[in-house]
Amino acid sequence: MIRRRKKVRKLRGSHTHGWGCKKKHRGGGSKGGRGMAGTGKRNKSKWTWTIKYAPDHLGKRGFSRPPEVQRDVRIVTLKFIDEHLEDLLQMGIAYEEEGKIVVDTTQFADKVLGTGRLTRPLTIKAKAFSAKAEEKIKAAGGEVILA
């Protein structure tokens, strides 16, 4: 149980409640505004501070592309295909056909990129290939099929 009396009870009738001049205990107006108030285009009351410490505070830069224009291209690399070939065979993404291994990347990726190298000839089926990927697949004795 708190028994201490509020200080305000002692100060009843006091004009300023211990704050000196009445002006001194006003809100943000006596402090030049709250936060970044006054840093706008007009008047520029805090302009020197703004140009020194927050030069990017005003103005716009760049743009954001509309979501309907953006495309999320799922990629897979030759390195990934070569390293995970056994897993792909178990999952049914890759299969053997006429003694050749066919990898159908259309199930999990849109484009095959040429990072890494192939250690065996593979037939790779995809929606798109980079130029380097096509080159490396053919150099390894494989085949490229656009789906």
Curated annotation (Swiss-Prot):
The keyword Ribonucleoprotein applies. GO terms for molecular function: rRNA binding; structural constituent of ribosome. One of its GO terms (biological process) is translation. It holds the Pfam family Ribosomal_L27A. One of its GO terms (cellular component) is cytosolic large ribosomal subunit. Gene3D superfamilies: 3.100.10.10, 4.10.990.10. Residues 1-43 are annotated as: Disordered. Transmembrane segments: none annotated. Part of the 50S ribosomal subunit. Binds to the 23S rRNA. Belongs to the universal ribosomal protein uL15 family. This is Large ribosomal subunit protein uL15. It comes from Pyrococcus horikoshii (strain ATCC 700860 / DSM 12428 / JCM 9974 / NBRC 100139 / OT-3).
